[in-house]
């Protein structure tokens, strides 16, 4: 009996840590290796749940998700991604909390967020509504844009962000560039090249957006541009090479799906990108621009300069710079100010109740923030940021529901603070003898 109980506990634990769904369910388990093939290249409608096995809300959703999958079988595809295990997929679609449900309709590159109820009935209703809309769009001749990946190389709209290179343009664009280049050498008749083309095109667009053009994807017809093919020893198709300034080209040996290519490109970007700027909040433009142009902006409120001196403040800034470099792949914004300088910002974020220094991370798009409640140390901040990167941690709405007003101020001059100089009082007219008599 004890062995039976232990076995049941072990099985339960295994299921809890490995995933919430099994092959016997009607829910299709999705991973980086099959997501593009199953979802992106599909003509049908998909509902995809991004979950974490440890998430209580996900566990409560599981039976309802299975119920919906069974009801929608052969009508609408219902899938699930263990985003705790496959973080690249979660990051690719901006998943910040669990569970997150997305509807992949006509335009698979721009899924819609599902905001409905968490019951099987509500999920089925939403799926059928989305399916009706998909059919109406098709009747109206709207395809939803590039999604199926079936266009050929002749369709320039599907590969607008892939740079076509030739023997004449290669050196100027690639070798003389400070950017990182991933170059595909292909042959028009090559079947593997045709299969790669839609993945390469979709990846090019996403990489351009996420790296702001610092990593570029290109293509060379090696049957026409034989000088390049000979120079780089191209003997099979497709061959992908990575070019970085001042280094010899290296072969790309990763997967051939969009997510694989994007993941490698982001790694290259992270390796070559300088650390993010750590900016002092001295006006509204700096604060709003930093927060609105990044998925998250990390705001540190340091003690007043009179409390720490220049040495103390610089030690805090060094910690922040170190962590900004560590998390630069996330492409967050980084800001700092001193206690009391931005009262409305502190008030909107609930900062100050735990003393200084303090920290918050703001999502300006959703007007929500998370507050550091651990120690303001490298280890404490790292744990806080790590939880954020996994979509964990509690959040709250920004006070007032909008970005707080920023008070313009002069930037810190890098020096120790000075106490205000008191005005000298002229005592020459004071009759001390008269004061003594009056006191008596």
Swiss-Prot record:
Q: Where is this motif: Prevents secretion from ER?
A: 437-440
**InterPro entries referenced in this protein's UniProt entry, alphabetically:** PDI_thioredoxin-like_dom (IPR005788), Thioredoxin-like_sf (IPR036249), Thioredoxin_CS (IPR017937), Thioredoxin_domain (IPR013766)
For the biological process aspect of GO, one term held by this record is: platelet aggregation
Catalysis performed (reactions): Catalyzes the rearrangement of -S-S- bonds in proteins
Q: What are the annotated disulfide bridges?
A: 55-58, 190-193
Locations of Acidic residues compositional bias?
Answer: 419-440
Q: Give the location in the cell.
A: Endoplasmic reticulum lumen; Cell membrane; Melanosome
Span of the secretion signal? Answer: 1-19
Q: Which UniProt keywords apply?
A: Cell membrane, Chaperone, Disulfide bond, Endoplasmic reticulum, Isomerase, Membrane, Phosphoprotein, Redox-active center, Repeat, Signal
Residue ranges occupied by any Thioredoxin domain in the UniProt entry: 20-133, 151-287
Region of interest (Disordered), ranges: 139-161, 399-440
Fetch the Pfam families from UniProt. Answer: Thioredox_PDIA6_C, Thioredoxin
Q: Which PANTHER family match?
A: PROTEIN DISULFIDE-ISOMERASE A6
Relate the assembly described in the record: Part of a large chaperone multiprotein complex comprising DNAJB11, HSP90B1, HSPA5, HYOU, PDIA2, PDIA4, PDIA6, PPIB, SDF2L1, UGGT1 and very small amounts of ERP29, but not, or at very low levels, CALR nor CANX. Interacts with MICA on the surface of tumor cells, leading to MICA disulfide bond reduction which is required for its release from tumor cells. Interacts with ITGB3 following platelet stimulation. Interacts with ERN1; the interaction is direct. Interacts with EIF2AK3.
Give the protein family.
Answer: Belongs to the protein disulfide isomerase family.
Descriptive protein name: Protein disulfide-isomerase A6
């Amino acid at each position: 009996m004890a062995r039976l109980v232990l076995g049941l506990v072990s099985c339960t634990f295994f299921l809890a840590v490995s995933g919430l769904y099994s092959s016997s369910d009607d829910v299709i388990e999705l991973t980086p290796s099959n997501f593009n093939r199953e979802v992106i290249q599909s003509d049908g409608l998909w509902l995809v749940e991004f979950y974490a096995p440890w998430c209580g809300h996900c566990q409560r959703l599981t039976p309802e998700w299975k119920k919906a999958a069974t009801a929608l079988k052969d009508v609408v595809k219902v899938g699930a991604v263990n985003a705790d295990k496959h973080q690249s997929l979660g990051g690719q679609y901006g998943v910040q909390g669990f569970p997150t449900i997305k509807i992949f309709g006509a335009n698979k590159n721009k899924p819609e967020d599902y905001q409905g109820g968490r019951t099987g009935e509500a999920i089925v209703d939403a799926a059928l509504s989305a399916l009706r809309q998909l059919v109406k769009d098709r009747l109206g001749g709207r395809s939803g844009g590039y999604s199926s990946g079936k266009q050929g190389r002749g369709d320039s709209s599907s590969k607008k962000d892939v740079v076509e290179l030739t023997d004449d343009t290669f050196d100027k664009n690639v070798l003389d560039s400070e950017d990182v280049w991933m170059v595909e050498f292909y042959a028009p008749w090559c079947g593997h090249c045709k299969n790669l083309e839609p993945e390469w095109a979709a990846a090019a667009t996403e990489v351009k957006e996420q790296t702001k053009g610092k990593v570029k994807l290109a293509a060379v017809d090696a049957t026409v541009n034989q000088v390049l093919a000979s120079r780089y020893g191209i003997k099979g198709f497709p061959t992908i090479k990575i070019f970085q300034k001042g280094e010899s080209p290296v072969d790309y040996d990763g997967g051939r799906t969009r997510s694989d290519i994007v993941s490698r490109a982001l790694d290259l970007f992270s390796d070559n990108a300088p650390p993010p700027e750590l900016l002092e909040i001295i006006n509204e433009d700096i604060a709003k621009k930093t927060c609105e142009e990044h998925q998250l902006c990390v705001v540190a409120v340091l003690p007043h300069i009179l409390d720490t001196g220049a040495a103390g403040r610089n030690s805090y800034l060094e910690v922040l710079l170190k962590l900004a470099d560590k998390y630069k792949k996330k492409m967050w914004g980084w800001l700092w100010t001193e206690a009391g300088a931005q009262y409305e910002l502190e008030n909107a974020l609930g900062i100050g109740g735990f003393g200084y220094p303090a920290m918050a991370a703001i999502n300006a798009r959703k007007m929500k923030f998370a507050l550091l409640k651990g120690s303001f140390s490298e280890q404490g901040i790292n744990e806080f940021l790590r939880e954020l990167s996994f979509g964990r941690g509690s959040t709250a709405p920004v006070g007032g529901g909008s970005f707080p007003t920023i008070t313009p101020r002069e930037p810190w001059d890098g020096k120790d603070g000075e106490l205000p100089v008191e005005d000298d009082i002229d005592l020459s007219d004071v009759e001390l003898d008269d004061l003594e008599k009056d006191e008596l």
